[in-house]
């Protein structure tokens, strides 16, 4: 069995502030980041904050997500040199979907376009 990719065992609470910072550098807000995460995962704001507080790793964070949005298949493009829609591993694909949506936010895309 292959060892888990280290990103799977990374705490969500460690990557979350990086998303907020990335957005903030382009004058986008924490609220917008949270809205994107809630859209993708189905977490409520309270549920999202609980996952951060519990220091869940990314694997757990996505495993516990109440409802991965059905329109994730519409998220396309390249993150870290890889086409998100071609990523085989479902967990890695979800992590990269989130990266991609945050990139779109930081690149000035309108929220109604990001939340497909």
Predicted regions: what is each one?
Residues 2-116:
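A charge-rich, low-complexity, intrinsically flexible signal that marks solvent-exposed coils, linkers
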């Amino acid at each position: 069995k292959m060892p888990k990719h280290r990103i799977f065992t990374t705490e969500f609470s460690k990557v979350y502030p990086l998303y907020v910072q990335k957005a903030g550098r382009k004058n986008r807000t924490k609220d917008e980041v949270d809205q994107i995460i809630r859209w993708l995962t189905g977490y409520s704001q309270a549920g999202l904050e609980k996952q951060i507080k519990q220091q869940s790793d990314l694997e757990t964070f996505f495993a516990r997500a109440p409802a991965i949005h059905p329109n994730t298949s519409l998220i396309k493009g390249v993150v870290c040199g890889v086409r998100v829609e071609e990523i085989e591993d479902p967990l890695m694909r979800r992590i990269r979907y989130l990266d991609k949506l945050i990139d779109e936010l930081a690149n000035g895309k309108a929220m109604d376009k990001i939340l497909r």
